[in-house]
From Swiss-Prot:
It is an enzyme of class 3 (hydrolase). This is 5'-nucleotidase SurE. Keywords: Cytoplasm, Hydrolase, Metal-binding, Nucleotide-binding. Nucleotidase that shows phosphatase activity on nucleoside 5'-monophosphates. Its cofactor is a divalent metal cation. It comes from Ruegeria pomeroyi (strain ATCC 700808 / DSM 15171 / DSS-3). It is found in: Cytoplasm. Transmembrane segments: none annotated. It catalyses: a ribonucleoside 5'-phosphate + H2O = a ribonucleoside + phosphate. Its EC number is 3.1.3.5. InterPro entries: SurE, SurE-like_Pase/nucleotidase, SurE-like_sf. Its main location: cytoplasm.
Length: 260
């Protein structure tokens, strides 16, 4: 198997190194693992692409490249430059430092990379590590990905539905905020929403008197509805959510069509 890897935390991120080891086991002796990751931190950039300016790309190793762009840019660089002669069988994005459950998925550069791969017609999986009081500050923050990642990805691949040209499917995987030994299993769930908590802009003054803003996230430990990703994670389960690049609200569309 030929695998392309990217992330949004950057080429030197520990989560990327963990995913590279997972990918090497998945690829097998005859396979190849290629990495094209951002040269700098790209967290929160979503699915943005840098179509207004050129993107520098540098070789960091035999099959490792750093691109000065977003995760989606890196996927494009991998498909149309680095691996143009033989495209990958699978694209993996992560392992993100922090959860991409619930509404976080809408901001995530990690998911942006996977979504771009799906739009390009490839199988893609985004992987993220949820942190909380039970696993924060551990010696190996990505131990769950290393111990469970191969099994999780293989199970997803084994159940991947037959692809349709109009159905750009990818998967969002979140590892729970517990030690690896306490993971209870996998749950297939919907994307959730953390009610009453959201991003905000917090004003501050610099020592020189200039006004600036910090963007602050909401309460990441807040439980979402039963049967959704963050709820499963807080209960100790790896969440797996199938997604596709179609943001249509079908229920609202039906109501709108009935009145227009």
């Amino acid at each position: 198997m030929r695998i392309l890897i990217t992330n949004d935390d950057g080429i030197n991120a520990p989560g990327l190194a963990a995913l590279e080891q997972v990918a090497l086991e998945l690829a097998g002796p005859g396979g190849e693992v290629w990495t094209v990751a951002p040269a700098f931190e790209q967290s929160g950039v979503g699915h943005c692409i840098s179509y207004t300016h050129p993107m520098l790309i540098a070789r960091m190793g035999e099959r490792r490249f750093a691109a000065e762009g977003s995760p989606a840019d890196c996927v494009l660089a991998g498909l149309h430059d680095v691996m143009k002669d033989a495209p990958p069988d699978l694209v993996l994005s992560g392992v993100n430092r922090g959860n991409n459950s619930a509404e976080n998925a809408l901001y995530s550069g990690t998911l942006g990379g996977a979504m771009e791969a799906a739009l390009q017609g490839l199988r893609a999986i985004a992987l993220s590590q949820f942190f909380g009081p039970r696993n924060y500050g551990r010696t190996d923050p990505f131990e769950i990905a290393q111990s469970h990642g191969v099994q999780v990805i293989r199970r997803i691949l084994d159940t991947w539905p037959q692809e349709r040209p109009d159905y750009r499917l990818f998967y969002n995987v979140n590892f729970p905020p517990v030690p690896a030994a306490e993971v209870k299993g996998l749950r297939a769930v919907r994307q959730g929403f953390r009610e009453g908590t959201r991003f905000s802009a917090e004003p501050h003054l610099s020592p020189s008197g200039k006004r600036f803003l910090w963007i602050k996230g909401g309460d990441q430990q807040q439980r979402t509805a039963p049967g959704t990703d963050a709820a499963a994670n807080l209960d100790g389960y790896v969440s797996v959510t199938p997604m596709r690049a179609d943001l249509t609200a079908d229920d609202a569309l039906e109501a709108l069509q009935a009145t227009l």
